[in-house]
């Protein structure tokens, strides 16, 4: 049995659209920009282990484990660098796999044009690290002992919407993308 099927017994979350104007049945995809599809695809497949398909001349779709995809669009020099808070999470099965991925990111930094590799940390209930790829997209390689998506929604709101966001405490805002 694959790790995906082992961890995610039921991958369907019923849409809660009774009170909404739009009545979606699924959140299907996201997008990110890249300088070069060819170079980015090499990183996605060889380093991150993502499945890629070139469905359009300026774009590829990438996925891993779930039927949710990211559209990577080649925009050349028009890439808009993003902050680490705008990142894509990739889950691995153990803390040791996080450590191995971190070591590999440092080892193959030049081969895959990885711009930054931040230290491994224990934060927000996960053991993880962030890295900035060749296109200024950020990735979090993480281990969580369970299925985080399910747990977050099962636990429900921990704070009232009247509670302040405490934006000044977000240390991630101090992390700068590379030039």
Can you annotate each of these PLM segments?
Residues 35-38, 89-138, 146, 166-179:
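Vicinal oxygen chelate
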Residues 2-38, 88, 148-179:
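N-terminal beta-strand motif that seeds the catalytic metal site of vicinal oxygen chelate
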Residues 24-25, 50, 111-114:
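Short glycine-aromatic motifs
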Residues 23-26, 81-85, 122-123:
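Short glycine-enriched loop/turn motifs at secondary-structure junctions
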């Amino acid at each position: 049995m694959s790790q995906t099927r082992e961890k995610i017994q039921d991958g369907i979350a019923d849409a809660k659209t009774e009170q909404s104007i739009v009545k979606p049945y699924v959140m299907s995809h996201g997008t990110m920009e890249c300088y070069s599809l060819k170079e980015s695809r090499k990183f996605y497949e060889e380093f991150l282990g993502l499945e890629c398909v070139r469905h359009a001349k300026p774009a590829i779709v990438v996925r891993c484990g779930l039927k949710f995809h990211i559209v990577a669009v080649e925009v050349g020099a028009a890439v808009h660098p993003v902050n680490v808070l705008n990142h894509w999470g990739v889950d691995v099965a153990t803390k040791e796999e996080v450590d191995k991925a971190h070591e590999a990111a440092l080892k193959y930094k030049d081969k895959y044009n990885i711009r930054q590799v931040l230290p491994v940390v224990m934060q927000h209930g996960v053991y993880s690290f962030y890295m900035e790829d060749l296109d200024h997209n950020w990735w979090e390689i993480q281990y969580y002992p369970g299925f985080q998506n399910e747990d977050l929604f099962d636990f429900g709101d921990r704070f009232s919407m009247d509670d302040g966001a405490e934006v000044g405490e977000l240390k991630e805002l101090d992390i700068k993308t590379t030039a």
